Amino acid sequence: EQVDELGRCGMSYAVCPWVSSFCGAAAALEAEYTLPGISQSVVITRMEGRTPVPEKESIRSFAAHQSTMVIFLSTGMLRRLSEELIRGGYPADTPAAIVYKATWPEEKVLRCTVADLAETAEAENVTKTALIVVGRVLDGEDERSRLYEPSFTTELRKASADPGKRGRPAREDGVRRTDRRAHSTR
């Protein structure tokens, strides 16, 4: 839309590559959006507001798949979002996160469940400029991509004879990754 308008106005412009805030949110969460046996798909969407969404692309329809969801432009509708996610098929206790101003210096990560999205945002006065991430990939389980599994052969690496412990390696700073379901802010 912006490029079309600039062209109509006769203004010159350059299109620069960028990194979407949904990728920044994954980094903030220290999470992979896809994990074997948990979710191999990511749905990037938004709640219906003043601009309609096709019924087949509604939150409820996408929730039926229980894939990882990244939801834009919906922070002001979190009660309704929770209802739609639950009606669509996510259990109320499904892990969720609100990532406020992903990649900005004032970034804040709020971990919660689908059921308590609104309360979590209200407690931190988050009313806009946030992404909602939903899915079991946020559980903190020790599942990892097969690509990085020592027992998995790739084009660049042979599998090790001793696959070792599954899961993410320990962090050097000593911070434990095990309880990602707890509320947290940064």
Which functions belong to the PLM regions below?
Residues 1-5, 9, 39-41, 49-171, ...:
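A contiguous loop/helix-start segment that scaffolds small-molecule binding in enzyme catalytic cores
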Residues 1-48:
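Short glycine-cluster motifs
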